[in-house]
Amino acid sequence: TGRYSIALAKEGFDVAAVELVESNLAILKENSRGFDSIRAYQGDATDLGQFADNSFDTTLVFGPMYHLFSPEEVNRAIDEAIRVTKPGGMLFFAFLSVYAIMYSNALYGSWTCYQKENFTKEYKVKHFQEQLFTGYDVCEFERLFDEKPVEHITTAAVDGPLEALEKRPDFSVSEKDFDSIVVWHLAFSEKRELLGGSNHLLYICRKMY
C-alpha cells in the first residue's frame, strides 16, 4: 500500500513498487500521489517479466515469502529478485519465524491446532497452500540460497518478541522505555540465538554476478 515505497522516496530513492492485489495497487497509487520517483506496477514476485535483467541497485522482497508455499514458487521468487538486481546490488528478503508464529498466535489460540498446521509429527516445518502465513526455521530459510549467486551478509530480527507481547492486556511501555528497547534491539538484532524469537526477519545478501 506504499508504506515502504513512500519512506524510500522521501529518502531520495527512485522506487519501482510491485503489488500483486489490484485493490492494494489502487491504494498504493493513491497514497503515492505527488511522488514522481515512485512507479507502481501490478505484478507477481514469481514473474517479474516487466523488468529487464540487472535493473535495480537494491531489491526488497517484503511480503511474498510469507505466502509462497511450494518449493517451485519460492525458488522462482528468489531467482526473479536476483535476476532483476544489478551485480553487486543488495537484496533484502523478509520472512517469518515459525517459532515466533507459535509464540505470538498459538499461545492466544489453540496450541494443538497451530502445532499440527506448522509441524509434522517429527517436528519438521510444514508449508502448504491453506496456510494464511508460512513460517521458517532460520537455517531452513538460509539454505534456500545455498546454490544462488549471492553472498550472505546477515540475517537480522526485525521486531523481536514485541508482536507476542503487544497482545497482552497488561503490556505497556513508556515512550522513553520504547526508545531504549529500539536501541537495545538493534544492538542484538543479528544475534543468532535470538533470531527465532522474532516474528519478522530479514535475509540480507549481495548479488555476486
Q: Over which residues does each language-model region extend?
A:
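A short acidic, Gly/Pro-enriched loop at the edge of an enzyme's catalytic core
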Residues: T46-T59
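A C-terminal cap/extension of S-adenosyl-L-methionine-dependent methyltransferases
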Residues: T154-Y209
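Short alpha-helix
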Residues: E130-P149, I153-T155
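Class I SAM-dependent methyltransferase SAM/SAH-binding core
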Residues: T1-L48
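Conserved class I S-adenosyl-L-methionine
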Residues: M90-F119
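A short glycine-rich, Lys/Arg-flanked "PGG" loop and its adjoining helix->strand segment in the class I
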Residues: N75-M90
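C-terminal alpha-helical "lid/dimerization" subdomain adjacent to the S-adenosyl-L-methionine
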Residues: T112-F133
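A short SAM/SAH-binding and catalytic strip from SAM-dependent methyltransferases
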Residues: D57-E72
